Amino acid sequence: MSSAIVAKLNKEDIIKDTVKDLAFEILGELSVSYVDSDDIKLGNPMPMEATQAAPTIKFTPFDKSQLSAEDKLALLMTDPDAPSRTEHKWSEVCHYIITDIPVEYGPGGDIAISGKGVVRNNYIGPGPPKNSGYHRYVFFLCKQPKGADSSTFTKVENIISWGYGTPGAGAYDYIKENNLQLVGANYYMVENTTVDFNYDM
């Protein structure tokens, strides 16, 4: 199953363009769903208006023994296509960070992500520039280092390039800088053909 997930991530160059050379192991399925809309299925297109409120997220490990009650998880959401897939002067844009998500299994064997942990950066719904093509909105679930004090994690005070000041910087840098271990991923695509946004960059 993990190889199938990696294949779908590779289909739209998610690994090449975001996590790059990071070593990782997909340990389960990261499920993302928005109200009154289709579930996110590793690359399906979504209407922009359906994604403005924070989604419901859960994680279902392939093997529960790989995550213990002592572990804490972090969720990241990023847009590597800002302002477009061919122009990266604003990328990546940080859309969401939650840390300290507890590993607590529900009746169905999944771990609830929504409503858990500490929100470090509030959810920002997709708002790509008009006629800039499809943007990839990528969710990463990571395991925090055991015993880590997440208050010392990098503070993302500027969502453009995750505050690193270099076009193309983002989730990769945050994961590496805070010694996180990538264990799950999902993504969807949004295109804006109707709304002119005024960006204060």
Swiss-Prot record:
Domain of life, source organism: Eukaryota
InterPro entries reported in the protein's UniProt record: PEBP (IPR008914), PEBP-like_sf (IPR036610), PEBP_euk (IPR035810), Phosphatidylethanolamine-bd_CS (IPR001858)
Single Gene Ontology MF annotation: phospholipid binding
GO cellular component: cytoplasm; nucleus
GO biological process annotation, one example: regulation of Ras protein signal transduction
PROSITE patterns on file: PBP
Family of this protein: Belongs to the phosphatidylethanolamine-binding protein family.
Note: Present with 6230 molecules/cell in log phase SD medium.
Protein name, per record: Uncharacterized protein YLR179C
Organism: Saccharomyces cerevisiae (strain ATCC 204508 / S288c) (Baker's yeast)
